[in-house]
Swiss-Prot record:
The gene is CYP71C3. It is an enzyme of class 1 (oxidoreductase). Its main location: membrane. GO terms for molecular function: heme binding; iron ion binding; oxidoreductase activity, acting on paired donors, with incorporation or reduction of molecular oxygen, NAD(P)H as one donor, and incorporation of one atom of oxygen. The keyword DNA-binding does not apply. It comes from the Eukaryota. This is Cytochrome P450 71C3.
Amino acid sequence: MALQAAYEYLQQAVGHGAWSSTQTLTLLLIAVPTVLLLLASLAKSTSSSGRGKPPLPPSPPGTLPIVGHLHHIGPQTHISLQELVAKYGHNGFLFLRAGAVPTLIVSSPSAAEAVMRTHDHICASRPWSMASHILRYNTCDVAFSPLGEYWQQTRKLMNTHLLSNKKVYSFRHGREEEVCLVVDNLREAAAKSPSTAVDMSEVLAAYTNDVVSRSVLGSTHRKKGRNTLFREMTMTNVDLLVGFNLEYYIPRWPLTDLLFRLVCWKVTRHLKRWDALLEEVIHEHVEMRKLSGDKEKESDDFIDIFLSRYEEYGFTMDNVKSLLMNVFEAAIETSYLVLESAMAELMNHRRVMKKLQAEVRAYGAEKKLDMIREDDLSSLPYLKASMKEALRLHPPGPLLLPHYSTADCQIDGYHIPANPRVLVNGWAIGRDPAVWEKPEEFMPERFMRDGWDKSNSYSGQDFRYLPFGSGRRICPGANFGLATMEIMLANLMYHFDWEVPNEKEDGCWKVSMDEKFGLMLRRNELLYLVPRASS
C-alpha cells in the first residue's frame, strides 16, 4: 500500500498517468538500495551525535524504506495527522518521516505557540522545493523565500505599500462594485427562473478572482479575458506546488534524473506563460505611467505600486513578477473556498442564517441602504462572528505553509534537530475538543463571548485560532481577504433568501461538507443554491 501511494504521487508529479508496472518496479529497485543506505547512515549519525541530548518527539511505529511513515497517512492528510498525533503524539507534537524527510507535526495551541512564538526565530524559514524555486524566478517571492534579508525587504514592501489597512481600504469601491455586479446577476437569474439553481461555487470563484484582478491590474482587469486567464494559471500553480516533491524521496541517480527533468520541464513551461502575460501587463502600466507623469496616486493598483517602489528596495523585474504571482495565489482561491464553505454551513444551519439575515436586514432597513458597504461591516457583530466561525472550521489551508527549522533547539523537553520540515495542522487546532465547545458544530455565538468579540482574532496571538498563521510568517493579506469575504457574505444575506435545490419540506436536506485535501481544502461537490430576492 505504501509503495502504491508513492507510485500515485509520482504519477501526479510528472503529469503522466500510464507508467507500466515494469517501469515502476525498475524505479523502485534503483531507489530502494540507495535510500536504505542513506537511512542507515542517517541512523548511525543520529545515534552517535545524539548521545546526551533529550529525545525526539514520539513517532508512529513502523518506518518503511522510501516512504518512511507515509503508509500511516491517508488521502485526507490533515485528518490522518490529527489522528496520529492523538494516538502517538505528546502535547500536540509528533515526529515522522515523510519519505526520507524528517517532519515535525504541530497539532495543539501550546505546540503551535512553542514553534511560532518562542522559537519563531529558528522555525520561520521555508524548505526548498524544486517546483517553487523554478516557478518563483529562483525563489524571489515572499511566501516561499527562506528567512533572511531579502524576505524582510519583500515583507516590508507588501505590508507598507500594498496590504496596509489604509491601502486595503482604498480598494473598497472596487470590491463594492464587484459585489453589485454579482447581486444584479443573481437578481436577474432569480427573476427569469425562480426555481433554477445557481452554481454558487462558480459565482464566488469568479467574484474573488475579479476583485483580486482589479486590485492588481486596475481598469484593464477584464481586457482580453485576462481575469479568467489569471484564474486558470493560478489554479495550475496550486496544483504544481502541492504535487509530490521528488527531490525529497528519490536519490539523484543518472537513471532517475529523467524524472527530475520532466518535472522541471513542466514547471518551466508554465512559468513561460506567466512571464509572457506579466510582461504584457507590466509594459502597459509603464506606458500609462509615462503619460500620467509617474506620480503615485491613491487609486494606483498593485502593479503601479510595485513600479514606483521596486528600485527603492533594490528589486529586479523578476522580483516584481514573483510577488505579483504570490498575490494571485494567496487571494483568489482561498477567499472563494472560505466563502463557499460559509454559505454551505449556513444552509445546514438555518437558525444561524436567519439570525444573520435578521441582523443585516434590520441594519439596512434602519439606514435605508441599497446595499451593505464596507463602512457598515463594523456594525454587524454577528456577521463578523459568522465569518470567524467559517474560518475556524474551514481555514484557507488545512496545514499552514511548511516551516523549516534552521538550527537545533529544545521544545517541550524534546530535541528538535536542524533541518526538519515543520507542519502546523491549523485545521486540527481549530477543532480541538480540549479548546472548543462542540468543535464540529457551526456556532458563531462562540465568537461573541469570552473576549473573542473584543480581541483581534486574526493577529495570530491566540494560538487556539490560526486561520492566517502566526509569527513572522503570518499571512500579510488577511485584511484584504477578510474585506473581500465579509462584504460579499453580508450582501448575499441582505438581498436574498436561499434554498437548496429540491429541498425537502421538513428541512432535513443537508449540503455535503465533504472536502478533498490539498494546499487548500476544496469541496467535493459544487454548491448549487436557489436565490430568491428578499421582500
